[in-house]
């Protein structure tokens, strides 16, 4: 192998296609993912076929999914493909539907412990097969980022912005700037050049070994409080059905009614082995249990603060910790500690 071939081999990227808008085909019934269709679309993009562009290979999952149908099974499968091919590629691009992309990014950040290569999730709001697709730049730039080995963590790239995967949130259903990271700075901004914010990127030692820690099926639920909520309607599911609960509260962790109806439910859920994590409905800011009287009672009842975690990250983290078969007390403790850059 000559020097040029060696360099190109080191720049090889694996593209994992899970489904989603970016590779969908127009049919009489509307857009749908179609097996083998994306491969021909990619080969028709001149920039992807240039000699000076990183070498790439396509891995197509089966079945291809609309991302609203993504489950733990698919999260584990995506991570398994990365784990089993880790030494063969310098980075990975995961093509994914936008609806649950932030959930998958969060999940991968926990399943792939010790990751020291870029894993970049991206997609599009307009299919590649359409004339005015945002997918071309998203894909091309994601491959470049994956090949450069700077942002060695699970990232999400969309419309000129590289975000930490477990800090990202989908902010627009139809806008091209669909994702933001309200509580964490950008990992990179893309204009004429890719400008990395190296201080914001996770730092890991060169000798870190990648581990594959798949999620197990665990009953997890999300409950969003609202004015007038009748907590009693949710008592059975909170106390008997769920192991982990993400409670989306007002502001910094406040609940309606002073917690009079909710607190006995939380105490009962806690005594039955559930872990209740409090996140804010606000995209920006942090949960501080005890900052207000209405949140102090939550802490006293056994709930833990999700701090500035997104709901997506909190859900994935609960799956992760329960899958490690930790005790309830260990899980409570770890929910408030940073594991993969998910909280400040």
How does the language model describe each region?
Residues 121-191:
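Internal gly/pro-rich beta-alpha loop/helix module
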Residues 2-84:
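ATP/NTP phosphate-donor binding region
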Residues 9-10, 16-20, 38-50, 164-247, ...:
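Accessory alpha-helical/coil subdomains and C-terminal extensions
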Residues 16-18, 94-96, 120-123, 155-159, ...:
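Short beta-strand segments
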Residues 252-344:
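C-terminal non-catalytic interaction/assembly regions of soluble proteins
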Residues 26-29, 105-106, 131-134, 164-170, ...:
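Short acidic, glycine/serine/threonine-rich loops at helix termini
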Residues 95-117, 257-265:
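Short Gly/Thr/Asp-enriched flexible loops that form oxyanion-binding sites at enzyme active sites
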Residues 105-134, 143-149, 269-280:
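Short, acidic/small-residue loops that bind anionic groups at enzyme active sites
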């Amino acid at each position: 192998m000559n020097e040029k071939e060696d360099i190109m081999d080191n720049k090889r990227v694996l593209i994992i296609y899970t489904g989603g808008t970016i590779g969908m085909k127009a049919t009489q019934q509307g857009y749908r993912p179609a097996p083998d269709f994306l491969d021909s679309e990619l080969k028709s993009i001149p920039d992807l076929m240039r000699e000076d562009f990183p070498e790439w290979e396509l891995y197509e999952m089966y079945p291809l999914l609309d991302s609203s149908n993504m489950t733990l099974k698919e999260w584990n499968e995506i991570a398994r493909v990365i784990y089993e091919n880790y030494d063969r590629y310098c980075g990975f691009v995961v093509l994914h539907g936008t609806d649950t992309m932030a959930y998958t990014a969060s999940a991968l950040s926990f399943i792939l412990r010790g990751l020291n290569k870029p894993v970049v999730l991206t997609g599009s709001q307009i299919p590649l097969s359409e004339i005015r697709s945002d997918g071309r730049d998203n894909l091309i730039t994601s491959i470049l980022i994956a090949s450069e080995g700077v942002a060695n963590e699970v990232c999400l790239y969309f419309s000129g912005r590289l975000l930490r995967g477990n800090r990202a949130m989908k902010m627009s259903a139809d806008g091209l700037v669909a994702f933001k990271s309200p509580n964490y700075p950008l990992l990179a901004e893309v204009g004429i050049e890719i400008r990395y914010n190296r201080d914001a990127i996770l730092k890991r030692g060169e000798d870190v070994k990648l581990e594959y820690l798949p999620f197990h099926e665990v009953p997890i639920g999300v409950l969003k409080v609202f004015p007038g909520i009748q907590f009693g309607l949710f008592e059975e599911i909170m106390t008997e059905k769920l192991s982990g609960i993400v409670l989306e509260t007002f502001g910094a962790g406040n609940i309606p009614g002073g917690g009079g109806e909710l607190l006995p439910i939380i105490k009962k859920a806690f005594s039955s082995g559930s872990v209740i994590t409090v996140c804010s409905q606000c995209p920006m800011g942090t949960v501080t249990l005890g900052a207000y009287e209405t949140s102090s009672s939550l802490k006293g009842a056994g709930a833990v603060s999700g701090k500035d975690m997104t709901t997506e990250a909190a859900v994935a983290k609960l799956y992760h910790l329960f899958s490690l078969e930790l005790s309830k007390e260990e899980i409570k403790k770890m929910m408030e500690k940073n594991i993969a850059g998910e909280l400040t």
